[in-house]
C-alpha cells in the first residue's frame, strides 16, 4: 500500500486544469491503487489526482449505490437535472464545511483503468461527489459553490 500525501488549499496543482490520461498501463493502475488506498486512509468520499499533486484527469469516488470505489478517468458529465443542497467538505480544505447547491442527478461518461468507456447515472451524495471531484480536474475548489459556510459541523 502506497499512501500519497493529500495537498491542501494553496498548492499549485489544485488551481490547474488537468491533462487527459492517454496511457492505460501499469503506471496508471498503480496510481489508481495508490489513490484508492489514500482515499480509504483519509476516510473521504472521493479523491482527484490534483489532490495528490498529479495533473491528470482522474478521480476516485465511492459509489453510494454499490459502496465500491470507482475510477473515473477522462470523465465528462453528459447530463444533469434538478438541484440539491448538501453539506460539503474537502480533503484539501481541512476543517471547512459549507452548504452547496449541486445537481440532484448527474450522468458521467468516463474510462476505466483499461481504457474502456462506461456511463453511470447517480443522485444524492454520489452526484455531489462526482461534481466535486470533476471540479478538481478543472482547478475548481468546492468553496466556489458554497452558499453558506457552517461554523460548527457537530
Give a label for each model feature.
Residues 1-154:
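Positively charged
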Amino acid at each position: 500500500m502506497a499512501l500519497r500525501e493529500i495537498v491542501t488549499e494553496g498548492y499549485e496543482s489544485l488551481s490547474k486544469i488537468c491533462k487527459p490520461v492517454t496511457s492505460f498501463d501499469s503506471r496508471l493502475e498503480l496510481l489508481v491503487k495508490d489513490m484508492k488506498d489514500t482515499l480509504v486512509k483519509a476516510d473521504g468520499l472521493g479523491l482527484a489526482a490534483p489532490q495528490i499533486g498529479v495533473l491528470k484527469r482522474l478521480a476516485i469516488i465511492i459509489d453510494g449505490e454499490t459502496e465500491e470505489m470507482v475510477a473515473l478517468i477522462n470523465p465528462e458529465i453528459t447530463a444533469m437535472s434538478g438541484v440539491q443542497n448538501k453539506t460539503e467538505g474537502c480533503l484539501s480544505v481541512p476543517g471547512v464545511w459549507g452548504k452547496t447547491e449541486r445537481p440532484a442527478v448527474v450522468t458521467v461518461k468516463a474510462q476505466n483503468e483499461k481504457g474502456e468507456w462506461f456511463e453511470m447515472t447517480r443522485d444524492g451524495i454520489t452526484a455531489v461527489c462526482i461534481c466535486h471531484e470533476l471540479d478538481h480536474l478543472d482547478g475548481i475548489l468546492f468553496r466556489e459553490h458554497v452558499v453558506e459556510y457552517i461554523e460548527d459541523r457537530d
